[in-house]
């Protein structure tokens, strides 16, 4: 008996399935139950009524390029290290079109954030999110941030993006160079929210 069919939960099926497993629905007594995302547990309801999402994909990536001072790039933000990478869906490699990118394991809405410390003494920095190599997806440009004053500036860009499984997301400079302070001062984060 299937409780979830075509992404729809049937309350009749829940009643039948839980009754078949000896669990009372009338008293809202539920034994530990898990919903799966592929082979990963996506949601757990404990017998105490707690709901957790232990394996939703998420990451915090940064550049760990050695040195000090400001770095610049005209392409993809070189996030070649992670603080955490739940599900291992962030690619820190430097080859291929999806380098320094998060690849969606499932269809859904994801939240992405890019926070950085910029140096813009002579240039405008416009980091933005690219999906599958394009900044123009769903007819909308996501996450453009202009920083164009002299000296150092902090900057945070975030966006909710609906992705299909195997879509990938990167941070790139829209035009010109993207200036960022080395190592841990600039981070690219993301997680599945629904």
Language-model region placement:
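Short, intrinsically disordered N-terminal pre-domain segments
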Residues: 1-15
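Terminal (often C-terminal
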Residues: 8-9, 19-20, 27-32, 36-40, ...
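Exposed beta-sheet edge/beta-hairpin loop segments within beta-rich domains
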Residues: 102, 159-163, 175
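Beta-strand acidic-aromatic groove motif in beta-rich domains, primarily in extracellular
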Residues: 122-129
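Short strand-turn-strand beta-turns centered on an Asx-Gly dipeptide
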Residues: 130-134
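Extracellular carbohydrate recognition and processing domains
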Residues: 140-156
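Short, surface-exposed tryptophan/glycine-enriched loops
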Residues: 152-168
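Short beta-strand-plus-loop segments that form exposed binding edges in beta-rich domains
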Residues: 172-178
């Amino acid at each position: 008996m299937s409780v979830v069919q075509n992404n729809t939960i049937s309350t009749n099926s829940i009643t039948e399935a839980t009754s078949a497993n000896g669990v009372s629905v009338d008293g809202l007594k539920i034994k530990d139950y898990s919903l799966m995302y592929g082979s990963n547990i996506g949601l757990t309801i404990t017998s105490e009524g707690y709901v957790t999402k232990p394996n939703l994909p998420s990451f915090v990536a940064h550049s760990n390029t050695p040195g000090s001072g400001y770095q610049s790039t005209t392409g993809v933000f070189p996030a070649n290290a992670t603080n955490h990478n739940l599900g291992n869906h962030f690619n820190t490699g430097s080859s291929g079109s999806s380098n320094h990118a998060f690849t969606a394991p499932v269809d859904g809405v994801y939240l992405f954030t890019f926070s950085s410390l910029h140096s813009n003494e002579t240039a405008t920095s416009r980091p933005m999110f690219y999906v599958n190599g394009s900044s123009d997806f769903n007819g909308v440009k996501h996450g453009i941030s202009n920083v164009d004053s002299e000296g150092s500036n902090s900057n945070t860009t975030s966006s909710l993006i609906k992705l299909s499984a195997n879509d990938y997301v990167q941070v790139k400079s829209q035009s010109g160079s993207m200036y960022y302070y080395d190592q841990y001062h600039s981070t690219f984060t993301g997680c599945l929210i629904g």
